[in-house]
């Protein structure tokens, strides 16, 4: 078995763990910030949320084994193990998308330390996109955690493969793409939220690092993040057109998934 196949297999195994954890985090955020305050008329205590976030809404059965945050919805066949009530389809979708993107990233990058920050970007991008699709918001905590994990991964990859100057590509990428999105946010905050700016900054970190070239230490990262912005705009335009046709009128739509998809495509293209 080749090294690439082993890495892909390991990435898929990792996705089996990461996918349910992402669902747990998404459910926690949606319940804490959106659903429970509407039901209770107040922000719930941590204990209230902790008792409900891994249980079936119908019968109260636990959906996670002891000591683990969640059990894969795919392994449960999308149903509660006790009352067999169908679980929300997006739980399985998050796990399947995470597994597919983990496998794709591992197949493209192969057995390299640079795979670590890409997997962190994928995990964070999936979580933020799921929330954005649900309520058109990108959790600040998700963005900060993803930025921290991606940065640590890039530092580790630079320490192993070098050169240290490549980290400047990450800085340039984050500054350029984050700055561009900030300007667009200031021009039209209704169409582009500040959460999108945070996500774009994280994407810029990875895209700038992978876009760095020894002969193009500045232009390379800038070109990479501009490509990411262009792809995001194209994906967003297509999504907006589809929604316009489906809904019959112009309405705001979540732009976070387009940024996440564009960032991953540019990173893999430069890997």
Regions found by a protein language model. Give the residues of each.
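N-terminal transmembrane signal-anchor/hairpin module of polytopic inner-membrane proteins
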Residues: 1-110
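Alpha-helical transmembrane segments in multi-pass membrane proteins
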Residues: 11, 15, 19, 98, ...
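Short, conserved phosphate/pyrophosphate- and ester-handling motifs at nucleotide-, phospho-/glycolipid
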Residues: 19, 196, 254
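Cytoplasmic membrane-interface segments at the C-terminal ends of transmembrane helices
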Residues: 23, 27-35, 71, 130-139, ...
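Membrane-interface loop-to-helix entry segments
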Residues: 90-94, 138-144, 251-256
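Functional transmembrane core segments of multi-pass inner-membrane proteins
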Residues: 115-120, 124-235, 240
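Interfacial loop-to-transmembrane junctions
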Residues: 240-266
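Juxtamembrane boundary at the C-terminal end of a transmembrane helix
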Residues: 268-271
């Amino acid at each position: 078995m080749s090294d690439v196949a082993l890495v892909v297999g390991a990435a898929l195994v990792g996705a089996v763990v990461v996918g349910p954890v992402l669902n747990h985090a998404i459910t926690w955020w949606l319940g804490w910030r959106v659903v429970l305050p509407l039901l209770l008329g107040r922000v719930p205590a941590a204990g209230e949320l902790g008792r409900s976030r891994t249980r079936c809404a119908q019968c109260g059965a636990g959906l996670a084994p002891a000591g683990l945050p969640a059990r894969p919805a795919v392994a449960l066949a999308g149903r509660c193990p006790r009352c067999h009530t169908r679980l929300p389809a997006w739980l399985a979708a998050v796990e399947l998308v995470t597994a597919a993107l983990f496998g794709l990233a591992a197949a493209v990058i192969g057995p390299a330390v640079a795979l670590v920050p890409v997997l962190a970007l994928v995990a964070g991008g999936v979580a933020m996109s799921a929330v954005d699709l649900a309520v058109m918001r990108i959790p600040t905590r998700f963005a900060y955690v993803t930025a921290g994990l991606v940065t640590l991964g890039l530092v580790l990859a630079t320490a192993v493969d070098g050169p240290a100057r490549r980290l400047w590509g990450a800085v340039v990428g984050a500054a350029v793409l984050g700055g561009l999105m900030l300007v667009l946010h200031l021009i039209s905050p209704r169409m582009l939220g500040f959460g999108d700016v945070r996500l774009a900054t994280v994407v810029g970190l990875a895209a700038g690092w992978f876009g760095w070239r020894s002969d193009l230490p500045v232009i390379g990262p800038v070109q990479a993040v501009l490509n990411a912005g262009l792809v995001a705009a194209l994906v967003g335009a297509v999504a907006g057109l589809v929604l316009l046709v489906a809904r019959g009128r112009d309405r705001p739509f979540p732009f976070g998934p387009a940024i996440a998809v564009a960032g991953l495509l540019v990173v893999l293209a430069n890997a």
